[in-house]
Amino acid sequence: MKIGYACTPITTNARTNRRILLKDFSKDKFLSITKQNLDDLQKILEWNIKNNIYLFRIGSDIIPLGSHEINNISWQKEFKDKLETIGTFIKNNKIRVSMHPGQYTVINTPKEDVLYKSIKDIEYHCEFLDSLKVDYKNKIILHIGGVYGDKKLAKENFLKGFKKLSDSSKKRLVIENDERNFSLDDVLDISSKLNIPVIFDNLHNICYGDNSYSLKEIYSLVIKTWNKELDGNMKVHYSEQDIFKKKGSHSPSISINSFLEYYEEIKEFSPDIMLEVKDKDISAIKCINSLKEINKTLNSKAYREEIENYKLLLLQHDKDFQKKLNSFSKDLIEFYNYLDKLLLSPKDIIGFKYSLELAFNILKDRISNRESLYFKKLINEKEYEKAKVYLTKLVKKIEFPPKELSYYISQS
């Protein structure tokens, strides 16, 4: 079982989503930005390994305007060596990667121009994974698309659109249930006709709300769509509802209690779990540590390291948090449960101010005098929320910031 996250880590500011505006497109700019994106992909994968994360979704913008007609540059040849180096790192470290085209990539559309662009976009994603020379266990995830007033016809159009894909794309494509158009049963039906795997998304299933299957029943159905030898381990998406936002919004962090309840129901299937959550790799580390603690393989240093990482965030909500921690056993899951409850509580004004000042002390040697004066001005004016927003901007300028700062800015 691997646990991972999507696209943009929090604990490093390496990123792969640099873009080019159409009006600014040139070969030199394209080569420069693509090189930066690929260099940072390598850094992110190396960083993930250090944090025991072996599942990662690569963002679609890794190759700027990768499927746009303006881009006639043979990026596969230009970056052949770099792409193969990244692919070798992925294979040597048994990392599993995936990609997920955006909502406008729909192969069941009735519009020919949209279908053409959608197929071209899927082929771009496939070409990227192929250029890494990774096997077909590294997938491209796609939603079915729109209903367009006739669900039966929309399903048939998906089957027709699928047939227009290259053989490589067909082998990489997996389909996911969504929250409003195509339910788990719909996706399983399409899967049975195309013989391709299904990605089960728990929150989408809850939002769609058309079945009362237990998780074990769902997993028993979904796992049959995966050929382990060809497609790899069954992969699922796990997320939780943000209680303060509209239905279907992902939570700021994974509640460890909810995750472990989920895990207890599905552990016999040993799936790879992609977390869809705002704090990305931080929640991945949280879930990985918790399962290691359950399986008695957790490094003894992990408890102290995580408290150190979270200390500013804890202080923001409780100036006396240290006294409470002293009453705990050295149990990381107990700590995470305390943390999850604390993050739902109002900020402690005294603790919030103190946490900002401590964060500033960690950061002060890396920022300009002007930035320092402005931050102090916000603190003196008791504009603590604005001070944290400003602090977040400053931290994001650092490629590998101290972890306690990354954890601190991961939550508002």
Curated annotation (Swiss-Prot):
Pfam families: UvdE (PF03851)
Family designation: Belongs to the uve1/UvsE family.
InterPro entries linked to this entry: UvdE, UvdE_bac, Xyl_isomerase-like_sf
Function: Component in a DNA repair pathway. Removal of UV LIGHT damaged nucleotides. Recognizes pyrimidine dimers and cleave a phosphodiester bond immediately 5' to the lesion.
Coiled-coil residues: none
UniProt protein name: UV DNA damage endonuclease
GO molecular function, one term: endonuclease activity
GO terms of biological process kind: nucleotide-excision repair; pyrimidine dimer repair; response to UV
Enzyme class: hydrolase
Enzyme Commission no: 3.-.-.-
KW Hydrolase (keyword) present: yes
The species this protein was found in: Clostridium perfringens (strain 13 / Type A)
Tree of life domain: Bacteria
Keyword Nuclease attached: yes
Keywords, comma-separated and alphabetical: DNA damage, DNA excision, DNA repair, Endonuclease, Hydrolase, Nuclease
